[in-house]
Regions:
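Long, well-ordered core segments of solenoidal/helical folds
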Residues: 48-60, 77-79, 131-147, 216-233, ...
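Non-catalytic carbohydrate-binding regions of carbohydrate-active enzymes
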Residues: 42-49, 55-89, 276-290, 297-345
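Bacterial N-terminal signal peptides
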Residues: 9-19
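Sec-dependent signal peptide cleavage junction
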Residues: 17-33
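Well-ordered alpha-helical scaffold segments within catalytic/enzyme domains
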Residues: 37, 50-58, 105-122, 137-145, ...
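Aromatic-lined, polymer-binding surfaces characteristic
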Residues: 186, 190, 194-204, 212-257, ...
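Solvent-exposed loop and edge beta-strand segments that line ligand/cofactor-binding
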Residues: 87-101, 175-190, 231-246, 272-290, ...
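Low-complexity, Ser/Thr/Pro/Gly-enriched N-terminal "stalk/linker" regions
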Residues: 28-99, 103, 134-181
Length: 345
């Protein structure tokens, strides 16, 4: 999905930012094999963040940075008496998924958590925090009660029948709202949403402690809901879930990192035991077990989780079991192959 590719672009560029000195000039991007001017990773990051702005839904300011964009999907939630506006549209469509918004906001937030200083050096810290907040503001709206989480606005039968600007979504398509509750569980969506909000509660603490506390409150409630009423979300065509245990582990470890509460750490390890993870995939929207294992390993220094992470990285190395293209790309899947290689890098 396009949204996921942009997420991974941010992840990789931020990894490189930590050792890069930024200047305001724009430098030509020549091949690193032949030398020449260096890549401007700060500009690459700025362009990747601009992609999210192009996909914003909701009430946009009159002086928006992209002048061709204006308010979109302003009726989201009206069918259930709520304001569910905001967030990002997904993958060139107009449907809004809580799952992928949570993954996107969580990945962007993880970057800030690990490389905040690099974003400051690039002059992009305020930009990425603003973009993350656009996503998390929607997630907070989508959780109006402790055991209620809205997971989708719009649906494929209506949305995929038209190729239209976002501004026409609620004029032409049906913006029906879909909900998770005790009778319709979705532990996968709840877990990854809790993770996104827990990360937000960490990264916003220095600049907006009141907002950070609000995110933490919702993260705890959403995690408790997903853990108590277990089951995969109802989606069977767009973003069907392979499992929910990885998402619960992801949410739990970030709640532990934020709160220091060992109950969350034990829950993360329970949902993701050291025997559960093979080598043959990587961190992505439908499988956050590798990211969860990495954070558990960093927190605990448990050799079992360290081995899980190293086994996965070994599989991605040349001659480790994965196909490599003639040009050197580690190739996992024909669908979004770059996102997988990029997140491992």
């Amino acid at each position: 999905k396009r949204l996921s590719r942009a997420i991974i672009t941010i992840l990789v560029t931020s990894l490189l930012l930590a050792s890069t000195v930024f200047t305001p000039q724009t430098h030509a991007a020549s091949s690193p094999r032949t030398g020449g001017a260096f890549y401007n990773y700060g500009e690459a990051m700025q362009k990747a963040l601009l992609f999210y702005k192009a996909n914003r839904l909701g009430d946009l300011p009159d002086d928006y940075i992209l002048p061709y964009r204006t308010d979109a999907a302003m009726t989201d939630g009206q069918d259930v008496g709520l304001d569910l506006t905001g967030g990002w549209a997904d993958a060139g469509d107009g449907i809004k998924f809580t799952h992928t918004i949570s993954y996107a906001a969580g990945q962007l937030g993880w970057n800030v958590y690990e490389y905040r200083e690099a974003f400051e050096k690039a002059g992009q810290l305020d930009v990425i925090l603003d973009e993350i907040k656009w996503g998390t503001d929607f997630l907070l709206k989508a959780h109006p009660e402790p055991d209620v989480l809205y997971y989708m606005c719009g649906y494929n039968d209506s949305d995929h029948g038209y190729w239209i600007p976002h501004e026409l979504l609620d004029v032409i398509t049906d913006r029906k709202s879909f909900v998770l509750n005790p009778s319709t569980p979705g532990s996968d969506i709840a877990g990854i949403t809790a993770g996104a909000l827990a990360i937000a509660s960490i990264i916003f603490e220095p600049t907006d402690p009141e907002y950070a506390e609000k995110c933490l409150k919702h993260a705890k409630e959403i995690f408790a809901f997903g853990d108590k009423y277990r089951g995969k979300n109802p989606l069977d065509v767009l973003y069907p879930s392979g499992s929910y245990l990885d998402d619960l582990a992801w949410g739990a470890i970030w709640l532990h990192i934020k709160t220091g509460d060992s109950t969350y750490l034990e829950k993360a390890k329970e949902c993701l035991p050291t025997t559960s993870l093979g080598g043959g995939h990587t961190h992505c929207w439908d499988d956050v077990s590798y990211g969860a294992a990495l954070k558990i390993a960093q927190v605990t220094h448990d050799e079992g989780y360290v081995a899980m992470v190293e086994k996965n990285l070994d599989w991605w190395m040349p001659n480790g079991g994965l196909t490599y293209s003639p040009g050197g790309l580690a190739w996992l899947s024909p669908w979004g192959s770059l996102r997988y290689a990029a997140v491992v890098a």
